[in-house]
Amino acid sequence: MAVAWIGNREALVERAAAHAAALLGSSRCPVFSLDTDIHGTRAAIALAERVGAAYDHADGAALSRETALFTDKGAMTVAPGETRRRADVVVIVGELPQIYHEFVGELAETVPDLSAKNQREFFLVGPNGASAPPLNNGRTATLLSCGEASLGATLAALRAQYRGRQTSQPVSNFDDFAKALAAARFPVFLFSGDATEGLALEMLQGLIADLNRTSRASGLHLPASENGWGSALASTWMTGFPLRTGFARGFPDFDPWRYDVARMIASGEADLHLRISSSIVPPQKKRSRMALIALAKTQKPVAGAAVTIAIGEAGVDHEAVVYSSRTGSLRSVDARAKSELPSAATIIHLVASHISAEAALPC
């Protein structure tokens, strides 16, 4: 089975890696899109430093909203295990990614063993018609809504009513919510940046801070992408900054607008795009003058790519270290269907071996 291509022609992996290295070495503004495990992220950041590239997550917008909450405003959060054991009121804020529906169902099936209350109550913040992840045993979440108002506006109204202030439109079922909070020992708000705007995340943290004036409350961050959040953590311990960092000036430079890789590609700033995705991804449109290097789980060359190298999927084709939202930390995973496909880190190291460590960085 072919695993590497230069253009549409099959090639040896070594030769394809050397060609990718030559393209990177001649690029004036390379950008990387990451969707990979911890080892792949670390290798990609090391390569970015060597060639002066900027790097971001493949779905950078959602991840940027989440990182901005922590870098710009700060957040009060709790671990998933503490949520399972202590949360007697669970508030689902907006829509959660599908991968977390099972976790919410487990919360509905269990009771907090470190709480005096032997039950959990569920609420959902969102517009009319919003639906919570399925709760087992026929349970439903009580909707807290301001009609068709946005999530941010609903959270603002919820916060105002909690503080006893007037609102232009009351939040539905607020009395039930206030009663549950009064009896709660530890309410937890589940949130994600996947479909939640930045101002809504900030307003949520304001509400949590208000609750902590008289009692305890916290939020549980459920990342829009587990790979993305793992990459953000790896980037932070390697450079001091999360994703959307660049090395164009020879040192790590964090700028969430400037190094928004999707924006850089759309505006024509980037002349080379290295996309690293250890899961199967559909072909993406690219600018005609921009070279594309694709490291992806694929059986054929990616359309329009100058170089394509097939890589395995973390936890499927090879062992890996990944971020786990169930534990709120990193964990190692075994290969579920081990194959001969190389890991992203292996290929990135191979590409880097063809680039001089003393190579001049772009201006």
Task: Give the role of each language-model region.
Residues 1-7:
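N-terminal juxtadomain amphipathic helix
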Residues 10-15, 19, 25-26, 30-44, ...:
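Gly/Ser/Thr-rich loops at beta-strand to alpha-helix junctions
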